[in-house]
């Protein structure tokens, strides 16, 4: 392992220490805004002392992930704090402004998944060090507020969409600071997985988010749950709002409740969501709250306008539904959709929650005059019972084998070789899109033999 040292980076509002290991700079937990409970993100004040950003950063308070059975306990041991609005940056050390000036590099900013209830941008499985080293890009992992702290509208207490506002604040930080890491603020590709991909879809329509004045120039949507986004969430949001008011108006006041107490309220709301078809995402961006104070028809129109000017790369895993069969079976029978007799539960979830609507968005991007890219990930260790399940693509893009080696979905004699060999090619593909390269084809099936 290469020796690790500290390096000073000057940002707009002050200086930080980042770590330098080999040819990669990594800054962890760089604050982009201040979080006040149930309030929009606030600007940070300039600072004079050098802030150390070389240690693991905190997560938004959260319960264990629903997908630990696939991914393993990826958040175990991480500190949690409501003061969690930070980014983590990985960049080639040879391109820093303090060294010989070079051409600014494309930026890939990443919004993690986790159903808007778990995850964080500084997790080791989402490290962009290997991606930055392999592709000559600057990678930024974004941490934002989750669950009841980030997305649940509570009348008289909390607006919705605070996590979406956090993401926009992080993108503004990138615009203002990424050149300090050798990144080009005019070449930002916003990538997101699962809930992160759904976030990008919402940012297409957000006030100041998408369109010609966008905070990002290209978009990668990985396994976006757009089928769940299309479900009628209105009644569920109202029911959870009422339940939250009851809980916070009693023995757990919103202003004084501890984070753990708020998570217990969130757990009750998640249980209440089982009466609704959209229970996969009880907490998610909601129309009627900033920056989405628009009608459904205006939302759709804004997405279509964004597709005209933001190049799109969209795709999914072949066996998405494997991860969610138990969740689907937990929907109350009165709210559970009927499954065609020709389809299995896994196939139905894969198509209706993820794949069909992603296919439609790709077609819409083509109709808008674009040349969108598409991928299907169809690779998994031969012995894995999870097949090419939801989140499988992440092991080939971020983190590397050392971070993912304990994930149950990668168990098998060929797991390490697949992650390393196929991952090298997948990283090239993601970087090629971020660079705007012409590969002579735009549709990709990623299997064990995949080469760019």
Give residue spans per PLM region:
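Non-catalytic accessory segments of hydrolases
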Residues: 1-158, 408-426, 434-441
């Amino acid at each position: 392992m290469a020796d690790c040292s500290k390096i000073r980076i000057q940002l707009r509002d002050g200086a930080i220490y980042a770590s330098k290991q080999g040819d990669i700079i990594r800054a962890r937990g760089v604050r982009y805004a201040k979080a006040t409970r149930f309030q929009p993100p606030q600007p940070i004040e300039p600072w004079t002392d050098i802030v150390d950003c070389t240690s693991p950063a905190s997560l938004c308070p959260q319960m264990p992930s629903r997908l630990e059975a696939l991914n393993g306990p990826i958040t175990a041991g991480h500190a949690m704090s409501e003061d969690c609005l930070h980014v983590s940056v990985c960049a080639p050390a040879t391109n820093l402004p303090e060294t010989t000036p070079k051409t600014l590099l494309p930026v890939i900013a990443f919004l993690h998944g986790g159903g808007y209830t778990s995850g964080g941008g500084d997790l080791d499985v989402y490290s962009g060090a290997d991606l930055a080293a392999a592709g000559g890009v600057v990678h930024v992992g974004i941490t934002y507020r989750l669950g009841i702290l980030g997305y649940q509208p509570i009348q008289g207490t909390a607006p919705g969409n605070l996590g979406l506002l956090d993401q926009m604040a992080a993108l503004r930080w990138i615009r203002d600071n990424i050149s300090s890491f050798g990144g080009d603020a005019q070449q930002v590709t916003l990538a997101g997985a699962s809930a992160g991909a759904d976030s990008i879809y919402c940012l297409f329509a957000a006030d100041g988010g998408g369109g010609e004045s966008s905070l990002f120039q290209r978009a990668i949507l990985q396994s976006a749950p757009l089928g769940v986004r299309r479900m009628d969430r209105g009644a569920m949001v109202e029911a959870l709002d009422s339940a939250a008011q009851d809980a916070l108006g009693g023995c757990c006041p919103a202003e004084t409740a501890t984070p753990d107490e708020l998570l217990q309220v969130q757990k009750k709301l998640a249980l209440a969501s089982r009466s609704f078809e959209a229970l996969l995402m009880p907490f998610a961006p909601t129309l009627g709250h900033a920056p989405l104070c628009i009608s459904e028809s205006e939302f759709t129109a804004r997405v279509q306008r964004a597709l005209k000017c933001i190049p799109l790369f969209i795709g999914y895993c072949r066996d998405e539904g494997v991860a969610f069969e138990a969740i689907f079976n937990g929907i109350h029978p009165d709210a559970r959709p009927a499954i065609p007799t020709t389809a299995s539960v896994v196939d139905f979830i894969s198509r209706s929650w993820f794949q069909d609507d992603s296919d439609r968005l790709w077609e819409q991007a083509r109709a808008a005059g674009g040349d969108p890219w598409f991928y299907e990930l169809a690779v998994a260790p031969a012995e894995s019972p999870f097949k090419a399940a939801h989140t499988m693509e992440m092991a080939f893009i971020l983190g590397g084998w050392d971070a993912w080696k304990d994930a149950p979905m990668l168990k098998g004699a060929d797991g390490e070789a697949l992650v390393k060999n196929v991952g090298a090619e997948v990283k090239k593909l993601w970087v090629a899109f971020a660079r705007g390269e012409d590969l002579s084809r735009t549709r990709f099936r990623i299997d064990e033999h995949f080469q760019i």
